[in-house]
């Protein structure tokens, strides 16, 4: 490349740069020139061309010719278009806000979840091995500790029976439990009932029927079928198993194998020798002619289960003896469980259901006949003398002389009886011993008479108070108290098992238990102890097929070794220590003793009273009376407790309510010694080793029939959500609800893919279930699901039939119970009518909740304040109620009430006791969400009240609700929205209910409270920000404060009636609804005649009658909706009059006319009239619970509306066919509900309302007889109408016949409503008024007001006024008095 070319390169680059710059310059200059030209043109157009165009236009002449008709047509067209735009675009805004699915009842928890529960099988959670079955059965002992449980199970043996074997149940050998298969338990019938079977032999066993079994010449009847996991032995049999046995008893239990040639002879020989020394549980031996004793109870496998075999686990009696020695506290727990089952299951069922109270009372009669022990005469004389002197002193002070009547006195002098010296004190004394009761100086006695041979002494820690009143001399009164306690001890059986008590005390001191007292009242302890430690040989029992043993071999020698070693080191307690321990116990009991005189014809204890105790009769007598379940029945005399006897024994020992009334004779009084039941229970808890002998004594006193019932009854524990019995199951028994609640569910459409579940109702405490199916031998018609943890007493069908044969009165009482249920069901709402009612799922009867839980949605809500107001309201309506919170439970049961298993058992027992004592229990959830008490409250509630702040804009799910959902409770849950004022913002309720499918209902409650810090603040808005800025202006602020003060003064002056409106209290309303004491108001349809409803409602307020639930039809739905929304008669009157004026306007109706294809009018003016009153308010926003009905002509059903826009469904309920078009909703056409039920009393009754005030304003049904032949001429009908002298009534027209046809079902429903119990039927005299006479508002209103005022005044004068809870206070004697409210006079 040459140098010339290289020099030319910079020149080329310079030319290119110059060309580019020039091009840019040209473009910019062109743009600038275009802008100048455009600007010039615009200015030219504005300044020159436009004015010139205007001048040319104005210089021309225009001429427009319009005819008058054209002008009018144009104006009419514009007016019509404007009207249509405004009418259908702007004035129908209320109709466009109905996109949500209104009126569709929420499904809630119970219908949806019940289906899931119905699908559960009771065998789903069936244990799969022996240990699980055993654990399930051992729960009857009450959550034993692991050490005690291991002590019982380590000696357990099992035995398997084939279908050809029969087991002779010997409860003295041990405690038996079925761990596999189903066992049939038979009991021997009496000789009289089985005499016709004497010619049959043992081999002739009837296999055609399982109810009876022939064994030799004895007949056995089926008592019960015991399934796997259930105990085969009676819980009462454990009492005998705890008692140590001597050598003779052990040898008596050993069978003799010598006579092994004959199977029957071997078995009979065994049976004759295997009878325990004590009375067996069902022992009532029936000897035949050969002297052979047949067993009272036999067991055989059920052939249709587990291939006809069963496996039984047996805990030998030695295991129980070791538990009693090592763990005496556990023994007392088991005894407590035995007594708990006795009073909760057996006695409760026998008294309240079977009506065998006399059988229970026989034990107390037997006690007084066999064991009554009177005091020495000098004790009684001295006591009467002191009481006489006391009465004389009181009479002199009050100037009212009184004298006690008493018997002749013994001539013994007090000084003589006071200082008698007895050497017999050295010997062991017995309660009731006359000589041992003589008062002497105790200090001298301790120095002289204690034996010197005592070699073992107690430790310093165990050596407590050794005398009665420290070192003070014992007075005669103290001696009297000790003598009384000794007699009571003897009667209740404490002296009979001193060996057990003494050994219990020793091991108790080793384990450092709560008490180290040792009772030694008998010198037989050493022989009992020696007998208990004697080893025994193995036992083997022959069976019927001679191929195996009746029970597995139990090596008693090996089982006795630990006990023998322990007992060998047991130091013998000296007589001194035994006596001192005896004094300590007597000391404690004597201190709680009250001695008093009761005058003639005085009632000491009333029947069913829980405040009772032990009454020892010192002088005089007490009469015992009993009254049947009928309150009007008189008291029936039972027996008399003479001097030395005890009254109130069963009530104190078992803990049951008093089954009798205890009175003194009409002419003479009585001197009694009284130990309150609470003090008695506390002392037995302290000296818990006394519980076993007391329970053994009670067992020996009970009759065979009661023990048989106790054996066969089942104590069923059903966890929450589990199925008690399923639809279609065999009815092999019926249940009595002891505690808890059950929901009745019925499944329909089983053959279809979608199975419907219908909730029929609920069963609560004390109600019985399933008698009809048992009596008719049919299958279960319903499924029962436990709402919460529940307990029932199951009465097997076989037991019921056996008792009915022996006591026909049982069948009579149960038949009456079933008949009363059938009779009551006639007045209950029909489940299925010929017209299906699509009732909301939340409207089933929620009768009488036993337990109510108050649970907040979030922390910071006034739970305690709400609970206090609710409890006060419940008490005011006459309920016996108690409120429980965590503090009260911890105070009663200790700080470990929710931690330990045994403590939880006590907790459940305490809750069950409270359910017996109180009508309503309120659980207050005042603890954090993680607390055990919160979970306990949720699980214990029959009804859960969920508190929420209605003014809180945040409607999210709170932490307490999350726990509620997590626990999967099936209890009814109601949302309580708390308002500061009695105002509900339209549409503010539905957001709370929208996402809470577990809520079945809601209540609006006014309660002033301060919002907690945890409650979320309200959302900010533009208006609030503007108000905040304006409040900074001083002038505006001062004006605002002045106006606010004026408004407060005005409200105060014009709201003086609040004090008188106690009947409007929201907590009283809530209390009545929860207690089945609600008052319902049902307003019927009738067009303008329904204006009288306003007058009736005004009269209700004047007379202070509360209204808790409102229902209505047609015009009744309108007036009822107004009252439910406003709850203020002034507002109702004004709005009803406004609506009537609008509807009665002729011009409005004329403008609403349309071509009468479906209806005469479009319904626009009618809709606007209703909407002007209710606006966008929803039924959920109404302050009072409300519902209305409509006729669904698409599905041919009656629809009940409880949610959705109020105006829409009230309009549907008022849609008269022909006049108004039907309301279209979800594709269905809704018409006036009066066509199906013009007075929906039946629907109100389904909501559990007790008092229903039904106001009927419908037209009178014309029932004039017609007789015009088989043919009818229309001309004759026309002439008959025109003929004033015709004797024939006017024949109805086609329109009249069609109208009557549509109201056929409504007329029948009205007649049924009049006959419904609890309905107060009102019909004002409004017949002269037509259906559309809305222009006569004031006249019709006054007719209704005057009628209601006169009727209510007449009711009050004649005593027919409804006894509404809260308005009438119940006295103790059953009388009632009207509650007067204080006037606001200042």
Swiss-Prot record:
Locus of motif DGA/G: 1232-1234
Biased composition (Basic residues): 402-411
Binding positions (a nucleoside 3',5'-cyclic phosphate 2): 697-821
Disulphides: none
GO cellular component: endoplasmic reticulum; endoplasmic reticulum membrane
Pfam families listed in its UniProt record: cNMP_binding (PF00027), NTE_Ploop (PF24179), Patatin (PF01734)
Keyword vocabulary terms for this entry: Endoplasmic reticulum, Hydrolase, Lipid degradation, Lipid metabolism, Membrane, Repeat, Transmembrane, Transmembrane helix
Stretches assigned to the PNPLA domain: 1081-1245
Enzyme class, broadest EC rank: hydrolase
Family: Belongs to the NTE family.
Function: Intracellular phospholipase B that catalyzes the double deacylation of phosphatidylcholine (PC) to glycerophosphocholine (GroPCho). Plays an important role in membrane lipid homeostasis. Responsible for the rapid PC turnover in response to inositol, elevated temperatures, or when choline is present in the growth medium.
Binding site for a nucleoside 3',5'-cyclic phosphate 1: 577-701
Superkingdom, taxonomy of origin: Eukaryota
Gene name of this polypeptide: NTE1
Organism whose genome encodes this protein: Candida albicans (strain SC5314 / ATCC MYA-2876) (Yeast)
Topology, Lumenal side: 41-65
Region (Disordered) location: 394-416
Membrane topology, Cytoplasmic segments: 1-19, 87-1386
Entry protein name: Lysophospholipase NTE1
Localization in the cell: Endoplasmic reticulum membrane
Active-site residue numbers: 1114 (nucleophile), 1232 (proton acceptor)
Enzyme Commission number(s) of this protein: 3.1.1.5
